[in-house]
């Protein structure tokens, strides 16, 4: 018995003195391993009488339990010390100044779109939307561009399945709106992405347009000039901005015109196209051209963004260069 008590006392003392997990595991192996001291005592029980075996065996098991309890307590203490050391090493210094997150910003083309919509909304125009994949009727035929019409050669079009196309302009939105509206007055602005096979410093295969439409009794070309001139002067915040309407041709308007503004270099700069809605277009959407007239215009939002922010290469808007885009943070 005394020998058992001595061995377990030495083992518990060694456990309590252990400084790390490796030392602790070595002590456990020395006392409870296959060849450990307490394990060896159990092997001697076979040499004892039944009465001694019962008494001494129970005592040895009790000592093993005491050793295991001491071992578990020391292991938990080492784990706690390790955790506290880690927390101390990773502690946050709440006296340090905070690091502010950089705020995001809207894309310059989006800012331009918002400005255009805001200005036309103030004139009583509402925003209309439509699908980017269009059928032949809405993208061409309803706009007075029938099959084999020479004007189709003006459009380098992306065709998809079943003869559908990626819309080449936002004019199909106007067609859909008038077909749904059934009866004028119609006064809408139709912004969105459009697609044409073109790519250089001033053109992109995907770009953004905004088209306006006003159909009502008594609408004239003078109304078109007044509305667009007021818009573009307010957009560029220049009341003295010179605007001219130059005769042109579009199959969906008659008469048609290109819109130019005077640049800072003293040269005219084209910024859009417009005209009075062609009678055939009105007929295609079940509106009586004898009773109603209307005008339509279209502008390139990317081009307006280039002019507004003095950007020379359209492709910069789509390169996702943060150094470039951060310039437009409000």
From Swiss-Prot:
What's in the GO CC field?
A: cytoplasm
Which residues of the sequence carry a binding annotation for Mg(2+)?
A: 254
What reaction does this enzyme carry out catalytically? tRNA(Phe) + L-phenylalanine + ATP = L-phenylalanyl-tRNA(Phe) + AMP + diphosphate + H(+)
Entry-linked Pfam families:
Phe_tRNA-synt_N, tRNA-synt_2d
The molecular function terms of the Gene Ontology recorded here are: ATP binding; magnesium ion binding; phenylalanine-tRNA ligase activity; tRNA binding
Classify the main location: cytoplasm
Compartments, as annotated in UniProt: Cytoplasm
Q: Which UniProt keywords apply?
A: Aminoacyl-tRNA synthetase, ATP-binding, Cytoplasm, Ligase, Magnesium, Metal-binding, Nucleotide-binding, Protein biosynthesis
Entry's InterPro entries? aa-tRNA-synth_II, aa-tRNA-synth_II/BPL/LPL, Phe-tRNA-synth_IIc_asu, Phe-tRNA_ligase_II_N, Phe_tRNA_ligase_alpha1_bac, Phenylalanyl-tRNA_Synthase, tRNA-bd_arm
Needed cofactors: Mg(2+)
Name of the top EC class for this enzyme: ligase
Query: Gene3D superfamilies per the record?
Result: Bira Bifunctional Protein, Domain 2
Q: Does the keyword Metal-binding apply?
A: yes
Gene Ontology process terms (BP): phenylalanyl-tRNA aminoacylation
In the record's cofactor note, how is the cofactor described as bound?
A: Binds 2 magnesium ions per tetramer.
Which NCBIfam families has this protein been placed in? pheS
The protein's name is: Phenylalanine--tRNA ligase alpha subunit
